[in-house]
């Protein structure tokens, strides 16, 4: 229900539940915590480095890119190329002598010097001296960056093996601390990966069990990522994934219960939330886990569904008569969630756009855990925010709970909490080799080092205390609930609205979409030439057979001699007149609206006639809609007013655009709607008459698109529809000399034929705008992250069976 809920309305509902005013004693306590944190962090080189190079700057991001990628590079030459690429174009000199730390200033001097020496010096006559400096500088810089990476690894990675981690954790119990060991950084890409990770978890359970034997309480636990246990952990594969994933997780959970090692299921991306809850419910409901109480769940408060999931978990625990530990976190994938929602064209974001809204939702979830959920849900509060910590402490709950922090962060805060209140703290502890866990590390640093986060702000003495102790509700009431810098996904484009997509990874939206798509199976379609409003039918039409199931979609009446001759005669009569630009562009905008209105039918046709997957069919309709709005705006921009060009004194050069005349548009089958619409609307927007010739394999889609175009107000004199065999139509039309431009997308061979015909049969130059097939290659060196590279390569090469001009 709350997945894509209106953020303004949801946050307002939250605000209505926070009427209380904080007293002076609360502010005094939070201030004391913050001052203690600042005093401790002032001695940390890493904290000072992150303060100077915060992750809202180009330099900060560059350092993270180097940290994440340089460690993978095995050879000096590639490492040097990476350093030159990343260091030479940044403003390192602005950071020199800005920090109170000698070591941070030294690093700034080194980076500034490196950047200057590594940057190409086009004005210097002596390349030999420059080359020598580059070589010396690269060696020094490479060593310095390598040292910085090792420092970061030592700070944020708990140990390289689980055995080493257990040894490191021995000293924690007397400080009322324990660990939650995370064995991995990223997800499984192959079945071999999944098996390897399963075995790593299985082995870790044995080792942690031995370490827990000496403990009275505060048992160490293991965090498990479901994406590590199956390479296709995604909703579209749920019928295959669910039984296999449940089996693997249940095996680990049963062993964990036998060894008395608590486990926690990590939260991941929002689109995986539903399938994760199905897995969790299936495993928790198994009889072998009855009455255990150490199977934990992670809830992310930046998600709008966090509070409703807590209610669901409470009901599940009540039904099963068990307790469920809940680790409440802010969330680790915010940047990706925002980007994905924008790419998909969703109506809303699944996460809050304001950090203060996430903080407020966290407090609401914490309140539920300490009140209504207290008998079934065991709270584990993971936060580095001193305000949040003090707020939870002062709820005066009798419920026992623990705090949690990330390895390398929040140590000074929880040392104070332990000393003042004796509340235990669990350390989320990544385990693994540095080069394997650096992507995880960078994500955590970006998440917690962004200039809006408490971890960053508390380090900056320039940020006044009153900003750090302000209730998130007070901030949201006094400012904007919505983030002014993050428009809704439909509003991210400047000149026109982003096309609306569908969240097919969510079961509710998927089934709603299919309920609207499937009824079109009952329709019977017809494709036939349309010339000046007249439809040309033939005696023996061919069946339009779906490549999906072999069923007939309707009939194809291909253009034959009568239709082709009528088309030539229509062009020769030349009665078409250019319409007003504003009327044309308004009609093209209405075409976009019509595509949106009929999108479920068009999705059906793209799937059944072109053989597209559901997601690709949705993307096809969206791209067609975007083409309409884009070309409409471009026409308004270039045709509305003349452009005065630069010229010499006494001379005036004026650029005006005008229609070319009749444009023949020939579109392919692999993008039967998007490219068809794109070609036609681009030509129409410029005031031309258009002859649209679609691919034979997808004539029904094109016919339906033409009907939508006519419904939008484009005259039947301005658009002629000519489906049929390519050469039978194209050759006589070009030979007639009545075509003034050709737009073609298809094979290189066909494009060369058309080019030759234009040359042979026309006395004047006739433009050919051709986008033809190509062979594509991707270059990836050792700086690339394999976990990101491989999925993109597979999608490019095999999505749509590789039938795209951009496919690998």
What residue ranges belong to the model's regions?
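Positively charged, amphipathic and often flexible ligand-engagement surfaces
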Residues: 1-501
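Long, K/E/R/D-enriched contiguous segments that form extended
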Residues: 189, 257-259, 270-284, 290-297, ...
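Generic hydrophobic/aromatic pocket-lining and core-packing "Φ" positions
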Residues: 253, 366, 680-681, 730
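A structured beta-alpha segment of the ubiquitous adenosine-cofactor-binding alpha/beta core
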Residues: 372, 652-654, 720-743
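Periplasmic-binding protein-like
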Residues: 380-383, 741-745
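Terminal low-complexity tails and localization/encapsulation signals of metabolic enzymes
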Residues: 436-438, 444-565, 569, 578-594, ...
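Conserved small-residue-rich beta-alpha loop and adjacent elements
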Residues: 641-715, 787
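ALDH superfamily catalytic-core signature
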Residues: 708-713, 735, 741, 748-808
């Amino acid at each position: 229900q709350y997945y894509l809920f209106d953020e303004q309305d949801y946050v307002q509902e939250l605000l209505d539940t926070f009427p209380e005013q904080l007293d002076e004693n609360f502010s005094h306590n939070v201030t004391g915590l913050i001052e203690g944190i600042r005093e401790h962090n002032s001695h940390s080189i890493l904290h000072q480095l992150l303060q100077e190079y915060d992750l809202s700057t180009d330099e900060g991001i560059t350092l993270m890119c180097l940290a994440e990628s340089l460690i993978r590079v095995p050879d000096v030459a590639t490492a040097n190329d990476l350093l030159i690429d990343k260091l030479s174009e940044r403003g390192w000199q602005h950071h020199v002598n800005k920090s109170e730390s000698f070591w941070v200033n030294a690093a700034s001097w080194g980076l500034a010097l490196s950047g200057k020496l590594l940057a190409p010096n086009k004005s210097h006559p002596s390349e030999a001296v420059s080359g020598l400096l580059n070589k010396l500088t690269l060696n020094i810089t490479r060593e310095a960056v390598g040292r910085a990476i090792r420092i970061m690894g030592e700070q944020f990675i708990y140990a390289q093996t689980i055995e080493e981690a257990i040894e490191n954790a021995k000293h924690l119990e007397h400080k009322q601390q324990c660990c939650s060991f995370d064995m991995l950084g990223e997800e499984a890409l192959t079945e071999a990966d999944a098996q390897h990770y399963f075995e790593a978890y299985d082995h870790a359970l044995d080792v942690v069990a031995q370490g827990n034997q000496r403990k009275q309480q505060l048992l160490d636990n293991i965090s498990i990522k479901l994406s590590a246990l199956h390479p296709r952990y995604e909703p579209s594969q749920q019928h295959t994934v669910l039984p296999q994933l449940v089996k693997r997780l249940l095996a680990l959970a049963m062993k964990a219960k036998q060894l008395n090692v608590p486990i926690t299921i990590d939260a991941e991306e929002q689109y995986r939330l539903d399938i994760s809850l199905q897995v969790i419910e299936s495993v928790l409901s198994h009889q072998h886990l009855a009455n255990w109480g150490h199977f934990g769940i992670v809830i992310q408060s930046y998600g709008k569904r966090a509070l409703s999931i807590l209610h669901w978990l409470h009901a599940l625990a009540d039904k099963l008569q068990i307790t469920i530990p809940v680790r409440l976190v802010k969330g680790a994938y915010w940047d990706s969630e925002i980007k994905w929602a924008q790419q998909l064209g969703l109506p809303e974001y699944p996460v809050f756009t304001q950090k203060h809204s996430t903080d407020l939702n966290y407090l609401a979830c914490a309140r539920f855990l300490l009140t209504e959920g207290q008998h079934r849900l065991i709270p584990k509060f993971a936060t580095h925010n001193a305000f949040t910590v003090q707020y939870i402490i002062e709820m005066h709950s009798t419920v026992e709970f623990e705090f949690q922090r990330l390895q390398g962060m929040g140590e000074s805060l929880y040392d104070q909490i332990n000393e003042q209140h004796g509340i235990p703290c669990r350390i989320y502890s990544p385990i693994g080799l540095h080069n394997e866990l650096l992507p995880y590390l960078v994500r955590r640093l970006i998440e917690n080092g962004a200039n809006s986060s408490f971890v960053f702000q508390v380090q900056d003495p320039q940020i006044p205390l009153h900003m750090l102790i302000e209730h998130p509700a007070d901030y949201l009431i006094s400012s904007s609930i919505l983030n002014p810098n993050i428009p809704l996904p439909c509003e991210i484009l400047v000149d026109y609205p982003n096309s609306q997509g569908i969240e097919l990874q969510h079961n509710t939206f998927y089934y709603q979409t299919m309920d609207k798509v499937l009824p079109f199976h009952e329709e019977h379609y017809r494709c036939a030439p349309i010339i000046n409003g007249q439809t040309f039918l033939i005696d023996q039409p061919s069946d339009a057979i779906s490549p999906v199931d072999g069923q007939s979609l309707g009939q194809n009446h291909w253009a034959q001699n009568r239709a082709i001759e009528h088309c030539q005669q229509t062009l020769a009569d030349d009665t078409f007149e250019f319409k007003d630009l504003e009327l044309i562009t308004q009609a093209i905008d209405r075409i976009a609206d019509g595509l949106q209105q009929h999108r479920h039918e068009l999705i059906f046709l793209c799937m059944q006639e072109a053989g597209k997957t559901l997601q690709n069919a949705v993307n096809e309709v969206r791209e067609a809609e975007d083409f309409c709005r884009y070309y409409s705006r471009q026409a308004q921009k270039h045709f509305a007013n003349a452009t005065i060009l630069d010229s010499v004194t006494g001379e005036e050069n004026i650029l005006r655009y005008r229609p070319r005349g009749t444009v023949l548009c020939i579109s392919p089958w692999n993008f039967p709607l998007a490219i068809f619409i794109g070609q036609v609307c681009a030509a129409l927007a410029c005031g031309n008459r258009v002859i649209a010739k679609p691919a034979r394999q997808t004539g029904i889609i094109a016919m339906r698109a033409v009907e939508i175009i006519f419904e939008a107000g484009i005259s039947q004199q301005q658009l002629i529809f000519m489906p049929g065999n390519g050469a039978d139509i194209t050759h006589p039309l070009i030979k007639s000399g009545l075509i003034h431009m050709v737009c073609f997308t298809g094979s290189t061979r066909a494009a060369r034929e058309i080019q030759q015909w234009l040359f042979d049969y026309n006395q004047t130059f006739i433009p050919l705008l051709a986008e033809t097939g190509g062979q594509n290659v991707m270059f990836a060196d050792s700086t690339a992250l394999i976990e990101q590279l491989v999925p993109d390569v597979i999608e490019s090469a095999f999505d749509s069976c590789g039938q795209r001009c951009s496919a690998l």
